[in-house]
Amino acid sequence: IVAVRDAANTIMWSWHIWVTDFVPGLPPTVEERYDPRKTQRDKVVTNYQGVQYTFMGNCIGYCYEGITTYDARSVKVRFTQAETGAIKVITLIQTPAVVNPGNAPYYQFGRKDPMLPGMLDASGSSVDKSCYSDGYAFKLSNDQSSIGASIQNPHIFYGVRISSWFSGALHYYNLWSADNMEYNVHNDNAVVKTIYDPSPVGYHLPASNAFTGFTFDGTHRSGYDKINTPYRDDTEATYNFGMELYCNKMMGQGSYDTAGGTVFFSFAGQRPYQRGKPTMCGIDGTCWKAVYATNTVIRRPYIVAPENTYSNASAYLVQPVRE
C-alpha cells in the first residue's frame, strides 16, 4: 500500500500496488481447462440471461506461489535420564499437508482498500499472511467508520461483530456503482465505476447478474450436475485451490457447452465480520459484485450461489470484469 499524507501525517489517499506476472487488458483467451502453470488471461463469460461479461483471469491482488506438498512421516526420538539411565522412545508423527499456493486480499463492500489476505499454514488452518509495515500494521476494529475515516485508515478492518462497517444508520448503495440506489437486486444494469472501486484501469466490479451462468438455472445450486463445472468430484478443486467454471452457460441440468473453455476462481478464502479473521482458505472463493451487499458464493465441494447477499462489513474477493 502506497499513501500520500498531509503535513499532519494524515493519510489523504492510498493505492494498492499489485506486483504480479498477470497483465490486465490483454485479449481474452479460450482455454479448455485451467492450467496453474500458465498465467491466467481474461475470459468471456455468458450468463443465464445471455449477457456476456469479460472476467479478469483471476481475482485482484492474487499471488500464485505454486503447490508445495509435505508427505506424512514419522521420527523417533530417544530420551535418556542421566541419573537412572532410564530410556524413553517417543514417535513424532507429521501428517501430510499442503501449503496454500496463493493468496489474495479481501475487500469490505464499498471500500477501495485491500484487507490483509489469509493463507493456509502447514497444518491446514487459515491464518493471516505476514504483514510488513512502518506504523500501519493491519488491525481489526469493533468500531464503525465514515467513508472519510476509512480512507485515512486503509489498514483497519472496521465493523468486527457488527453487520455494517458504516457508522450510524447510513447505507451507501452506490459506492461501487455510481447510479445504483438499490439493495439485494440482481440485474444486468450498467455499472458506473467509482473512485472506490479497487479494480485496475479498464475493469470494474461485476453487475449483480454476471455469475448466473454458473448454474443450470441461474440460482443457488449444489451438486456437480447443477453447477457449470467440469469437476465431477472434490479432487480437482482441492488440488487447484479453486474451481473451474465453463464460460458458456449450461444448456440444462447436467448439459454443458464446453466450446467457450473455462474461467478459474480461486479459493483464497474470506474475512467474515463476526471475527474479522481469515477463514475457509482453500475452500471458498466468494466474490463481491457492484450492487450493494451482493456477492456470489463459489465453494468446495460443489456449491455456487450466483444471487447471494451478505453483510457489507465482511470482506471477500473481487474478480472484476472489463468496462
Report each predicted region and the residues it spans.
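C-terminal, surface-exposed recognition/capping segments
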Residues: 146-323
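Short, compositionally biased
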Residues: 3-193, 291, 295-296, 308-314, ...
